[in-house]
Structure formats: structure tokens, C-alpha cells
């Protein structure tokens, strides 16, 4: 079955589209990518998305027009990736504007902006969208949803395997081994903390918007990370919350960056970027240390996906700090890093079409199996 997946993440840099052919057992599918397309948001759209996500108040008219524009851009990406409309289903995540983690006294919340019925009619195809609301209604965080699909896409090894996504936010999937006493264990997943969100903001600020990200980690590699400050940051209570846990740009965004910059004082942009990038690697390393400390789980391999996997400085820091773990890009096992999340939502859309529910208890914390996504027919 052919499915088109559309994804735009918390980095808000654009839309990734992937056309996939799925066959076989939905839990262990065979899949083949037939085409891909990536659309970069115009700077005006990206700025508006980030500003609204950071709390900018806009009128109802502006809100509607932003939703229409994002929907139309997703339609453009879909048509470009699948010009003959061969997909039986189109799965579209929409653009996240706000995410609220579950608190003891308050349910979680997550807002993705997309007009699903409009997209279905623009494409004249079945659309699956609104993937997070059922999970949240069932007491879950609604994130990280990629962890629900990773095992099906990458499979198991003879030891514990991790999949790390480095988008705006870093999240981890922990996949049990295929043999031994742990083979009946559950797949785990959680949001770790900031990845590209802080670094991208800092790069833009420190270069007066001449750069929007640290390509290949070139700026970070010229700086010296402030390790004492990083050790202090790692004591943030969020990093000690037991999974399932989730977060977003509203927690690790502009205001958080300003607070951390104040603590760092007057330092060069290279030292700033190096410190923030090393901070991300340290968060992951601390999570893996705690995974062994509290659950006696030690990874043999960590596959890295997302834009951060192209950051050579960050990849070196991960290998340095995650002792005894083989760290490598997910591309090396045939999963295209840039399109992994689009592939995930294509998979969830395929499962929705088939009526396949997923048990998210150990990943999002939702209390019952869920059929992810809402179907709209044209």
C-alpha cells in the first residue's frame, strides 16, 4: 500500500514529504521509499510560527490565514512528492505551535495547526491528521510518537538499541533485544530536552540572522564549552522526571536561552554555541546513565536521526560522552535521517487505515491502546 507522509517539526524549518510502499505484517513491515521532497518555509512563515509558539498574540483572522497557508504548503509538498496522486492515504502531522506536558493536576496538551478537511479536498485524497489528541485525551503526553514506530521500522538487535532524534527537541527510543531474558521487555521512549531549538536561536541571534543554524557544527567546533555551567544546567528538575515525559519550544525556547546566556556572561558566539551543543550531548549521556542506574539497561548502539545528526561536533560529543555505545547516523541502516519523522507519520497513517491500534503506555503514558490520527475523506 502506498502512503504519503508529511512532517514539519519543532524546528519549523519546513515540510518533509515521503512516498512509501508498505507490505507485509504491519508490526514488522517491509517498506520502500519511492520518492522524497523537502520544502523550506519562507523566512516570514518560519518567523511567524516560532513567534506564535513563543506566545505572540495574533488575531483570529491571522490565525485562520496561518492555518490556511500551512495547509496549502503541505498540499504543495504532497503534490510535488507524489505528482500522480498514487498514495491511497496521506498522513500529515501539521505544524506544532504549543505543547504542554502532563502535570499531576492538569492533563497535557498539544496544538498542531492544519486544516485536515481542506487538505483532503485540495488533494482529493484520504487524509489522516491530528495524531496527538487521542493520546492526550487518554492521559498521555501525546509525545514522542516516533517511538511508537521505531521498532517496526529499524528492528531489533542482539542487545538493547537506541534511536535518538535530534530535531528542535531531542527524544529517545529504547528497543529491547530480539533474544535473551529481555526480549519480552517493552519499547520505551521519552523527550530528553533541547537539541536544535536553543542552538538555532543562539546562532541566529549571535550572527544578526545571517545564519539560522550551525552547519556541520563549524561554529561549535571553534569554541570551548563551559563544562562547569553545563553541570549546573543538568540539575534542572525536568531532566530528573521519570519517563514518560515530554517537552517543547515553550519550555526550551527564547526565554530559556536568555536565562542561560545571562549565566554564561560575556563570551564569544563560538563558546556559546559550543556550550549549548555540548549541553545537548550531556543531556543524552545523563539519560543513558540513568537508564542503566534505574533499569539496568545498557545500549550497545545509538542510531541518530534528525537535523542534529549532520552536526559533526555534536556527533563527536555524543560518541565521547556515551561511553561504550556505538553511535552512528541512522542513514547507515537505510533509514533516511531527514525523512524519518515523515516516514513515522506515514506508518501511523497506514496503521490508521488498517485499524491497527498501538499500546503507548510505556512511551507516552496513555492508559489504553489508541488508533492514532483522525481520518478525513475528500
From Swiss-Prot:
Alphabetical keyword list: ATP-binding, Carbohydrate metabolism, Kinase, Nucleotide-binding, Transferase
Keyword Protease applies: no
Enzyme Commission number: 2.7.1.170
GO molecular function, one term: phosphotransferase activity, alcohol group as acceptor
A GO BP annotation: peptidoglycan turnover
Annotated transmembrane regions: none
Pfam families, sorted: AnmK
Binding-site positions, ATP: 9-16
Pathway terms, separated by semicolons: Amino-sugar metabolism; 1,6-anhydro-N-acetylmuramate degradation; Cell wall biogenesis; peptidoglycan recycling
Domain of life (superkingdom): Bacteria
Record carries keyword ATP-binding: yes
Catalytic activity: 1,6-anhydro-N-acetyl-beta-muramate + ATP + H2O = N-acetyl-D-muramate 6-phosphate + ADP + H(+)
PANTHER family in UniProt: ANHYDRO-N-ACETYLMURAMIC ACID KINASE
NCBIfam families: PRK09585.2-5 (NF007145)
Function as written in the Swiss-Prot or TrEMBL entry: Catalyzes the specific phosphorylation of 1,6-anhydro-N-acetylmuramic acid (anhMurNAc) with the simultaneous cleavage of the 1,6-anhydro ring, generating MurNAc-6-P. Is required for the utilization of anhMurNAc either imported from the medium or derived from its own cell wall murein, and thus plays a role in cell wall recycling.
Family under the similarity heading: Belongs to the anhydro-N-acetylmuramic acid kinase family.
The protein's name in its UniProt record: Anhydro-N-acetylmuramic acid kinase
Gene source species: Prochlorococcus marinus (strain NATL1A)
Gene from which the chain derives: anmK
